[in-house]
Amino acid sequence: MAHSHSHADSHLPKDNNARRLLFAFIVTAGFMLLEVVGGILSGSLALLADAGHMLTDAAALLFALLVVQFSRRPPTVRHTFGWLRLTTLAAFVNAIALVVITLLIVWEAIERFYTPRPVAGNLMMVIAVAGLLANLFAFWILHRGSDEKNLNVRAAALHVMGDLLGSVGAIVAALIIIWTGWTPADPILSILVSVLVLRSAWRLLKDSVNELLEGAPVSLDINALQRHLSREIPEVRNVHHVHVWMVGEKPVMTLHAQVIPPHDHDALLERIQDFLMHEYHIAHATIQMEYQMCHGPDCHLNQTPSGHVHHH
């Protein structure tokens, strides 16, 4: 049998990415604090709910910035994959905090239906418009001259763009209160914004838990990959012991491949590596080639019967 371990060289993030993320984080975090103060002073729950949404933006920007900074640190003997998993842990903690905060806001909104409180619509409007402008500015900072291949910056920009809807919700609530004096618009809009935050937080929680538990990327069908590999490379008779997990943004894979004894081991290994790289963008793979069928009790430990591929 033969082993092969390959990985593509990681390129250091550009400094301009870190600067843009830092500027966007400062703007977003600053206006988040302004919305908290404005929400307390005006009595607007919609502003507080939108501040919670901006908290998700600030956290996403901070995590992206941490990835840029920590990815510059080389792996060590104790941390062989570097420090990328730290951002996943922070995302997990942040997601739990967001769920708790959002549920508290929803509870407060329900209470306000029964015990309405006065809302300063004009102050609420000023703060909400400022928050909207902050989101637009942060999105512009991230989008201008952005590196389309930088997933961190792209994800952060999309996250900020999603928060624009929350700011619009607070503005709509303020307009209704100013024009009609109907204060229930505030808790109604705060609940709608909270639903958006919960949706984002729940997705973040699921993704972070999946990565912390070293789950396979949800976009990758391991059984389909096994069939595809055996179909594209005839020398591969069976693929088993397939494990895929994420380290930061990069997928890592190990697999066993039962192959017809090749004349050139290195050439076959290179073909398998090229297949994984070009078809599935997996640049970091450890491949064990075997000449005999796997007969151990754990041969199909991590695959369904449909994933068992055997060519006669």
From Swiss-Prot:
Subcellular location: Cell inner membrane
Keyword Cell membrane included in the entry's annotation: yes
Gene Ontology CC: one annotated term: plasma membrane
Gene Ontology molecular function terms on file: zinc ion transmembrane transporter activity
Transmembrane stretches, start-end: 21-41, 48-68, 90-110, 123-143, 164-184
UniProt topology in membrane: Multi-pass membrane protein
InterPro entries per UniProt: Cation_efflux, Cation_efflux_CTD_sf, Cation_efflux_TMD_sf, CDF/SLC30A, Zn_transptr_ZitB
Listed SUPFAM superfamilies: Cation efflux protein cytoplasmic domain-like (SSF160240), Cation efflux protein transmembrane domain-like (SSF161111)
Keywords: Cell inner membrane, Cell membrane, Ion transport, Membrane, Transmembrane, Transmembrane helix, Transport, Zinc, Zinc transport
Assigned protein family: Belongs to the cation diffusion facilitator (CDF) transporter (TC 2.A.4) family. SLC30A subfamily.
Function comment: Involved in zinc efflux across the cytoplasmic membrane, thus reducing zinc accumulation in the cytoplasm and rendering bacteria more resistant to zinc. It may contribute to zinc homeostasis at low concentrations of zinc.
Protein's UniProt name: Zinc transporter ZitB
Source species: Salmonella typhi
Encoding gene, per UniProt annotation: zitB
